[in-house]
Amino acid sequence: MTIALGRVTKEENDLFDIMDDWLRRDRFVFVGWSGLLLFPCAYFALGGWFTGTTFVTSWYTHGLASSYLEGCNFLTAAVSTPANSLAHSLLLLWGPEAQGDFTRWCQLGGLWTFVALHGAFALIGFMLRQFELARSVQLRPYNAISFSGPIAVFVSVFLIYPLGQSGWFFAPSFGVAAIFRFILFFQGFHNWTLNPFHMMGVAGVLGAALLCAIHGATVENTLFEDGDGANTFRAFNPTQAEETYSMVTANRFWSQIFGVAFSNKRWLHFFMLFVPVTGLWMSAIGVVGLALNLRAYDFVSQEIRAAEDPEFETFYTKNILLNEGIRAWMAAQDQPHENLIFPEEVLPRGNAL
């Protein structure tokens, strides 16, 4: 009995191979398979944002001016969220709300859902791009894994939080001042600064900035003198065969400063990766909790004592009162459709608070 072994011949012009060859070709700007998701979504997200901030009003959704055309500047322009009455509608241009009318679609806040969803997929495409390139040049995928932190924050804040609330209306609008207002909203309605997940997020981001500054300064301080160049950047010569800086010297320096120091480059750099990414993920988890209206720390005993004793006050009780002021002022402004009416004595008085 004879068994013939051989390869199955593929067509020379196989469509997949042609596309793979073109997409992954070495060019100035790598495209790749991930680019099929990244580039269109990033183009539409940025294009929608520039269009909205330039031309589109928020009068119909928030009663606000939000475009350059209406007199806003870069800090005050925004692509605003849809009205609360539209709940979690995807607001498709051809959907029942806009019915194919582009002007009506913009007035209803359709650009916000357009930018948010395309932006989320663009970020995912960018992470896939890092996976794809890492595989192509045989690198570990830690860059892509690290980028999951910003993606988690974006998705939790712009998508999951409003999904847990009554509609997209309660998500942040895409603008600088709009984001600031959302932060104030988070503080007033969720006491966000006292949330342990926010604390871990702040520790991660600021700790990463500190680590980055210390690491950069230490490397600069311990660069080898490898030539007669006039400046520090001589040491960045890519043809240099040996390592650029002295880990031993850096370890000795920080051992004397703190009593402890990293003695292993891999552990040092993993720690620099771990701190900010963990901080971002903790913040994202905290925002998911807020979507479900989970509360931050409540020191009820201090609130009760402050209510009983006018002379007893802590920074916590002062902040609780400030949060009440934010809620009283913001709720009526942001949700006029609720017809919220607060007695005059509980409302802040002008700029005096």
UniProtKB/Swiss-Prot annotation:
Record-listed pheophytin a binding positions: Q130, N143
User: In this UniProt entry, which cysteines form S-S bonds?
Assistant: none
Locations listed in the record: Plastid, Chloroplast thylakoid membrane
> For chlorophyll a ChlzD2, which residues are the binding ones?
H118
State the family it belongs to: Belongs to the reaction center PufL/M/PsbA/D family.
User: How is this protein organized at the quaternary level?
Assistant: PSII is composed of 1 copy each of membrane proteins PsbA, PsbB, PsbC, PsbD, PsbE, PsbF, PsbH, PsbI, PsbJ, PsbK, PsbL, PsbM, PsbT, PsbX, PsbY, PsbZ, Psb30/Ycf12, at least 3 peripheral proteins of the oxygen-evolving complex and a large number of cofactors. It forms dimeric complexes.
Q: What is this protein called?
A: Photosystem II D2 protein
Q: What organism does the UniProt record list as the source?
A: Oryza sativa subsp. indica
